[in-house]
Structure formats: C-alpha cells, structure tokens
Amino acid sequence: MAHTGIRSSPTRRLATAGLALLVLTIGSGRKPAVAASHREAPRISLDPPADITDFFLFRSYEPGREDKVILIMNVFPGGEPSSGPNYFTFDPNVLYAFHIDNDRNGKAEDVSFEFRFRTEIRGLVDQFNLFVSYVGCGVRTPPCATPLPPITSLDGPGSEGLGLRQRYSVTMVRRGQRLKLAEGLIAVPSNVGPSTTPSYDTLAAQGVYPLPNDIRVFAGQRGDPFYIDLGATFDTLNFRRNPPLLTPAEDSNDDVNPFGIDTIGSSNVQTIALEVPASLLTVDHKSPSETGQPKLGAYASTSRRKVTVLTAPTRSGEGDEDEDEVSKSAGPWVQIQRLANPLVNEAIIGTDDKDRWNATEPEEERQFLDYYLNPRLALALQLVFGVPAATSGRQDLVDLLLKYEPGDKRLSELLRVDLRTPPTPLAAQRRMTVLATPPDPAGWPNGRRPRDDVTDIAVRVVGGPNYVGARAGDGVNKNFRPLTVTFPFLATPQVGRDRVHQNPPAGP
C-alpha cells in the first residue's frame, strides 16, 4: 500500500517543527518515545517471566537523594493478583540486566548490572508439604483453629509461612571487569491477602537492601505503573470518545481520567529496581553538576542460555543459581528481549520483525530504519480517524529515538537521560512532560518516569502536528494506584484476596 500521508514540503516542515521541542530535549535535558512493552512480540508473549513490560531511567526525585540514578525493570505482564497457589516469581534460568552507555558511542557496554535468582521451598510449606506457596493466619474472622504465623518477615521469625522464597545476586560489570555486589538477597513475595501477608508494606520495605558503593536494590512484586486504555487501543484505536481529543482543561488535569479506562491498573508485575550514585555511572566518575559527559543511554534485557534440557524434578532446594529444579541450561547467554524507549517494538516495529528486533543489540538499529522513517502507527491513525498524519520521511523520529544529537551518525535505540536536568518532585510532575504547559523537562523522552504518559505523548508525536494541536489521547491521565515518593517508587501491589474483576469506570 502506498503511503497516504502529507507529502508537501510545508507540511513536512510543520511536522518537524511540531517535534522540534522534543528534539531539543535530547540536548537540554528531555526526549520522546511511545508507550510500554506488554507482550509486544510473538515469541516473548509466550515467556512471561522474561517479558519486560516497562523500563524506567531517571534521576531520583526522592528528597535528599537527587544525586542518584534510578533504573527499574518490570516483567511478567498482566499479573492477576489472586493467581495462586504459586503466584509470580522471577525465572532462575533468566539473566536480567541493565546496560549503560556513558561515552555516547551508542554501545551500552560501559557499565552493566546483572541479576540471577534461585528458588527454595521451605518453612511450613515444606514441613507439611502443603499445596500452597504462602500460608499464614493474620487478620481474619474467625481466627484459624491452629495459629499459623502470618508472613511478616523475609527471614527468621515471621517468615515461616514464606514457603516459596527466592534469593538473588547482583553483579556489576564495568568494561569487562565483574564485581559481585551481593548474593543471597531475598525477593519480596506476592501480596496474597490480610491473613497471609497482613502488613505488606512493612514486609516490602525489608526488601530494600543497601549495597556497596551507596547502591540500593529491590526485587519483588509491585503494582503495574503503566496506564492505558488497552482494550480500546487494540480494538483498532476504538477509543471511548470519537474523535479521541482532550479539552485544554482535561489535558492539564493529571488527576482525572477524562473518558478512558485504565485497563491494566489492577494488575501486578515483578520489579527489579536499582538506585545508583550518578558518579558511579558517568564516564569521569563525577556528579551530575560536575561531569563533562552528562548524557547516559541505557536499556534493559533478558537472556536465556542457548541450550535448555528438561529434567526430572528434584527435591525442593537442590537447585543452584544456574538451574532450577526442572531444567538444566548450558551454553552462552542469548538475548530474548530488550527494552529502552517504550513501545518501540510494540507500535513501531512490524510484526514480521518483532522477534528479530528483540534479539539484536541496540547499536544494530539501522537495519530497522524504515520503520522509523515511515511509522505504521501514524498510518493507522490516519486510516482510522481520517486526519492527515506524518506517515513518511520521519527523520525527526530517527533523531529523537536513535541519537544523542540530531547530527550524530551512529544509530542506537537507547533510552537517554541528561543528568544536568534537575529532577521534578513527584507532586509537581506533569504527565505530558515537555508537551505540558508549562513543560516538565525531567520526563520522557529525557529518561522515563513512572508518571509519564507515554501513550498520549506517542500518539501526538508520531501522529504529527495535527495530533499535537488537537490534544489526541486515550483518555487515561493517571494510574489506578498511587505512586510513592520513595524508592522503589512503584505502588503497593493489588492484594490478591480483594481483587475484583471490574475495571474502574471511565472518566466523566
């Protein structure tokens, strides 16, 4: 099909001008993207524990810790909170990793952090060979006939009911030199319910560990921070207002959903969060205000060994960090998913190439250049709504998503952050970041925070000036659950016992 987009030079100039502010953010402390990455490719949709739903990179906005850089990876999309008896865990056969480019050569191999998990069956579940992973008699009426201690601790007294427990290690790799920062850390379990996990926030706080070099880490369940009217979006852009345009008042109100439904707001995810001093990541080991290279590029990845052999299950606890109880893996690690800017693979890369894209390195992005120059999302918007979109010749998207500066020759799909931009406190953050009035330069595409509305930003930026000016969006302006101002920043996961299969109503 021939592209039917606007082709005249004046319109092309309008499209470029409409994105000029975002292009400038790469150099001044901002930048764009598209959305999230839930089940975005055929192969990874069959592998939930390795499926990265979101990747966040930003300067910490926790008071007193603004000199830190935050990296967050979420996996396991669509986590149903009540999904017992095993709930959700990380996969011991997956290598989870963050990769950082600090010298702007487009190769995110300067600093990396790797995470490996192992699973053990223990406590009351092992003692009585119970059919559930977690057990406890906390807040309930009437009380249990036999007093079983609820899960109030990750280890020691109060952890007896934590039957399925995961420990993990953290390794930092700097230019090929490996340093194990920690091992034997405990991942926070799922939020089962008031009887089993009665003081969940207190339990989760125990999962924040201090590491050497003033690093902090968290692994465990959190509420899914991504917000979108998912059902309406994938019903061929069948939004709940036609055309899907926000009024100026609606667009400036980040606390009300004008007409959309946060479809995945009550789902949970498995989170790996890392807080690192900026000086540990910069090429010259200096702070954000002192470094001569303030721009970082990064992405998250999941990998599996090249060969996996299924084996007969062993007795619980006999596995090690390289294998779980039912499989053995060998050979080199093979990348099976990557994520930097949100929704690139979901809304830009064509279905035929999605699996191949996930397996390639970010610096190999030139082979996918046509998808950026001729975005299919823009074409879809034009076909559905009949409003001209910028469907071809989109060098502006190439500059935004694949470069540190528009003049760069190297193309690399990384999420980039300018450390010179001061973080915006959570209460003052604007979901539309640089498209807001007034602009908030500390959000996507200058890194990405959980609050940033990458769906609406993507629709407008990819659609072009007509969609920017008309304030197009999905009608969801906020997450179903409130974010926190402290590390690891994501909301308390939805409690399993109280999960109701009813989405919050559409906005007024």
Region roles according to the model:
Residues 32-508:
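Surface-exposed extracytoplasmic segments
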Residues 9-21:
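Sec-dependent N-terminal signal peptides
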